[in-house]
Amino acid sequence: MNEDLKLLLDKADTLKGELSALRPLPEDALQKIQDALDIEYTYESNRIEGNTLTLQETALVVNEGVTISGKSMREHLEAINHSEAIDYIKDIAKKDIEISERTIKEIHALILHGIDRENAGKYRTVPVMISGSIQMPPQPY
């Protein structure tokens, strides 16, 4: 193991110990952590699709309803829709609902709401790529 990796792992262990000492975390702290993770998930998910909103702009759009100058309506809707899809998935998990093909299509429809009515909730029929990646998603053949 190289020295840089060892230092990072030691730092992670130290931070984990500090976090463990604070347990159980207060409910409001847990909610803040979850909210931050949800925004980061929305930001990263949209970023790989070519959305140019920054992490901070994504938070403003989702949490405050702010319109960002110079950004397209599509980019705003992608952030809002992704956030709403996360909430929907959490609701499904809380209710212990079985995930079905219909559920997956409903999530997809939420993601594309107001963006691509023709394809919302449907399987894609054309190949896609991830911006800046050599990884190829499953193709629709």
Language-model segments: which ranges?
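FIC/Doc superfamily catalytic core
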Residues: M1-Y141
